[in-house]
Amino acid sequence: MQGTKNLTQGPINRQLFTLAMPIMATSFIQMAYSLTDMAWVGRLGSESMAAVGAVGILTWTSGSIALLNKVGAEVSVGQSIGARSEEDARSFASHNITIALLISVCWGGLLFLFARPILNIFELKQHITDAAVTYLRIVSTGLPFIFLSAAFTGIYNAAGRSKIPFYISGTGLIMNIVLDPLFIFGFGWGTVGAALATWLSEATVFGIFVYKLRGKSAVLGGFSFIVPLKKKYTRRIFKLGLPVATLNTLFAFVNMFLSRTASEQGGHIGLMAFTTGGQIEAITWNTSQGFSTGLSTFIAQNYAAGQKSRVKQAWRTTMWMTGVFGSLCSLLFIFFGSEVFSIFVPEAEAYRVGGDFLRIDGYSQMFMMMEITMQGVFYGLGRTVPPAIVSIGCNYMRIPVALLLVHMGMGVDAIWWAVSGTTVAKGLILTAWFVLIKRKIL
């Protein structure tokens, strides 16, 4: 099939590594957008970081919703390629893009119109809320770029051409790195400058994707971006992508509640520590997400082609690699949490509280890697419900656990322990679930 790679033959370890590395690098680039903003906005002070952090919860929610079509494309297009059905692969690609555009316009409009009442949830000082509202309204107008780029990335990943999204996203990151200090400090625009820099970078990434997909060597031989939706393809995409998007979106809503609790217990410093710490923790999350996505694509093609032995070997190899990296991240956060946090927010009180977050969260990093790797296995098999059940159940347990620990007098640390403990549970439960059903499906 034109513009695709056959992953059902050849050395498994090398294929997994060459597929996962660009995806992981792309995830790091997407994370670097936030880290770049944090590194510069942090120089404005903890209040500015709190404003950007509050909006960060909502942009995380947006990215979670965008997973509907990223995962939907990776699995539906990937399985169609594995089954040698070129027509279905193209139709799934077109439908994912169309659905992504519709959802992004509706969601972006809601955030723009209701920015202030949404951000009032965090109960921040009025001037911090005002800055956050302006930031959110700018960011919300760029959501179609994010959603469509996610769908484009999923299509390329499904085709085994994960290097292309990496190069395109890298271009956007370089642009963001250049524009951030220029807009924030050079023009004196502060947090507004950070929002505009990110908006322009995301628009550039979208434009390059469109240019590549309209070129002569387009993936899948080219396909329409906007099509009338057909029930057959739409239902399959929602069946695959909706559980993933739901679990990540509900996860974001849980974090919104925990962010408010952090604000109540520790003021804007507590909120800043939680949101900024979560972005730093993305070092682990994005690494595992890269391997998980690569594993999902590999399994989707091989499972559809009946190559079950390759599926099992790929799972074992990926679990070993992510386990090693997760252990290293645990050591970094546990022993050097404050030092890492101070890179982004140099205020003493900020990196003291933030260092506590990273230390406590560090105990769960290996288990986070386990959970996200297992998500990739289930997604590649077309079974997206089990990860959703485990993730939603454990994530919502964070709320009563956090409230209980707060009631016991643990203060803002209660939230950190609730997050860490439930992350351990998710990794263990999802791995055990797969081990129990492995013989039946493989």
Regions found by a protein language model. Give the residues of each.
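Transmembrane helical elements of multi-pass membrane transporters/channels
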Residues: 18-37, 138, 149, 172, ...
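Small-residue-rich hydrophobic transmembrane alpha-helices
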Residues: 49-109, 146-165, 273-331, 335-336, ...
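Short runs within selected transmembrane alpha-helices of multi-pass transporters and secretion channels
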Residues: 70, 74, 138-157, 165-173, ...
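Residue-level hotspots within pore-lining transmembrane alpha-helices
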Residues: 29, 33, 62, 66, ...
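Short alpha-helical transmembrane segments in multi-pass integral membrane proteins
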Residues: 1-23, 77-144, 186-242, 299-364, ...
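Hydrophobic transmembrane alpha-helices of multi-pass small-molecule transporters
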Residues: 61-64, 176-181, 206-210, 282-286, ...
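Helix-terminus/linker motif at the lipid-water interface of multi-pass membrane proteins
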Residues: 28, 32-50, 119-126, 182-189, ...
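Small-residue hotspots at the loop-to-helix junctions and early N-terminal turns
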Residues: 46-57, 136, 195, 268-283, ...
